[in-house]
Design a protein with these regions (language model features):
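Start-transfer (signal-anchor) and selected internal transmembrane alpha helices
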Residues: 1-21
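Extracytoplasmic catalytic/substrate-binding loops of multi-pass membrane glycan-assembly enzymes
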Residues: 24-39, 50-67, 74
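Membrane-helix interface segments
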Residues: 75-76, 101-109
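Transmembrane-helix motifs of polytopic, lipid-linked glycan transferases
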Residues: 81-105
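Short helix- or helix-capping micro-motifs
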Residues: 108-118, 134
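Short acidic/glycine- and proline-prone juxtamembrane loop motifs at membrane-interface regions
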Residues: 122-132
Length: 134
């Protein structure tokens, strides 16, 4: 297998592994994680933001965790699963931007690794600023 075929596969492996890795560990809670929990829980129960309950930010931040609550159940680990999904999407979007710009494949793999370690991997709990950026 040539490196031109191997490097895109390596990029995807890096993105998925670094996004899913925090699910397998006991991670420390982030401050104010209850905001993610409560908003997603209320949405998953059918309540509407700004009508049934107040939110400090826009309502779309809680949609993905609420969908994951419906699929996987209302548990704290579900917030990590939702964030892993968002991290995979953000990594693939970053990879797509690099491909569109025409970055050298070796530089692209290095950039994806740096992005995943410095940005995506550190945001393993749902956080408003990260989700809005994605």
């Amino acid at each position: 297998m040539t490196y031109k075929k191997f490097l895109p596969i390596l990029e995807i492996i890096i993105i998925v592994v670094l996004a899913v890795f925090p699910i397998m560990l006991t991670m420390p809670y982030r401050a104010y994680v209850y905001l993610s929990w409560e908003g997603a829980y209320r949405l998953s129960e059918g309540q509407l933001p700004f009508r049934d309950f107040g939110l400090p930010v826009g309502g779309m931040y809680w949609v993905v965790p609420a969908i994951f609550f419906k699929i996987f159940g209302v548990q704290v680990i579900t917030l990590l699963k939702a964030q892993a999904f968002l991290n995979i999407l953000s990594g693939l979007a970053f990879r797509s931007i690099l491909k569109t710009v025409g970055v050298n494949p070796v530089v692209a793999v290095t950039s994806v690794l740096l992005y995943c370690i410095s940005y995506s991997f550190q945001n393993f709990w749902p956080w408003y600023n990260h989700s809005v950026f994605v």
